[in-house]
Amino acid sequence: MQISKPDNFYDLVVVGGGMVGASFCCALEQALGETPLSILVIEAISPNANSAKQSSFDARSTALSFGSRKFLEGIGLWQALDDAVSAIHEIQVSDRGRLGCVEINRDEQGVEALGYVVENKRLGQVLNARLNESGKINLLCPALVSSVKATEKGMLLGLNHGDTETSVDASLVVLADGGKSPVCEQLGIEQSIERYDQHALIANIVLEKPHQHVAFERFTDTGPLAVLPLQLIDGKNRGSLVWTLSVEQAAQYREMNEEKLLPLLQERFGYKLGKILEIGQTFVYPLSLSIAKEQVRPGLALLGNVAHSLHPVAGQGLNLALRDTRALVDVLINAKQRDLGLGEMNVLLEYVARQQADQATTTQFTHNITKLFSSNNEAKVWLRKFGLVALELLPTLRRSLAERAMGLSKS
């Protein structure tokens, strides 16, 4: 629920009410049941949960794994999204200009869908509506954290809310305010960053032919190009485009109009879905692998892009963050049941230990694919050609890759 003035103390303060922060709060609220816990969410941007406007053509989209669907179902959010998502029944992976195409389908994996694509605006509406309806979660918005300091109790936050300045103590602060977190910078938490010298161009596109719930991942000399299935709107066959470009290409393409950009995209993607008829508003941003050197401190935990920001090649960023979210909620509920302080370091280290392997494996998996499929080095060209053939011939290997993509891998 929205509040105009915060209390002086909260058991938990979440900085950032976006997809990760809001999902964490919704999951925690459900897990708490009748257990009392004071929660404050600080969000810089005013929510628009009650807007009657539907998701526009230009809304960006997110790929959700099958595992993320199960998580959102478990916290009662999937039901509100179900009519706004497009299921992925098959994934086709190919290397542009070379033989070898791998098809991974839902029947082979024995699941209803390999994943889903949801438009960010709709996901935001559902999450914001839940926060506003909650009787346990206090939402201060728009508000900014102006200062942060460790105390014996946990953390002391200075807040700017409209024309008002105030402060709040918290046993635990969960940072979920994105990859360029000003709070992280204030605390001196460093990031390990590897820049890929690539940019992603993201847009929604209109296609001549229906996608038939197939997602396409096409590897090119400048990096991967993905087209994910979206729901029909006004009878238009739509897809979500993630196009990896060199720095030079990104500088050129971001200034191009639709007429100039369409033939370039068509040449790169091909005609599997016929002609590309329209490109919506484009978003261009640099790509890197960024990992926080500290994910926890006494009274502090990091979630989402502030903890780890991945290349979008495998669509693992939000899905990993939701697995982190589930783990942190479990650890905090367990601590509450044992009457331990939420911000105690031994509690937070349980969370780190639980997610360390998943985070390391997922980030390395994404990084390796990025390096392998963005290179024209002959050895890597041969290796990825061999890899695609191996995936085509070996169902067990294909199943392992699919399980990782679906967020169901145990390793």
Short names for language-model regions:
Residues 4-20, 40:
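Beta1/beta-strand and adjacent pyrophosphate-binding region of the FAD-binding site
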Residues 8, 84-186, 194-199:
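Conserved N-terminal helical subregion
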Residues 29-58:
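Glycine-rich FAD pyrophosphate-binding loop
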Residues 54-96:
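N-terminal FAD cofactor-binding segment of flavoenzymes
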Residues 72, 162-166, 172-275, 280-282:
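Conserved FAD-binding catalytic core of PHBH/FMO-like flavoproteins
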Residues 251-338, 342-343:
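FAD/FMN-dependent oxidoreductases across multiple families
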Residues 330-411:
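C-terminal helical "tail/cap" subdomain of flavin- and related membrane-associated enzymes
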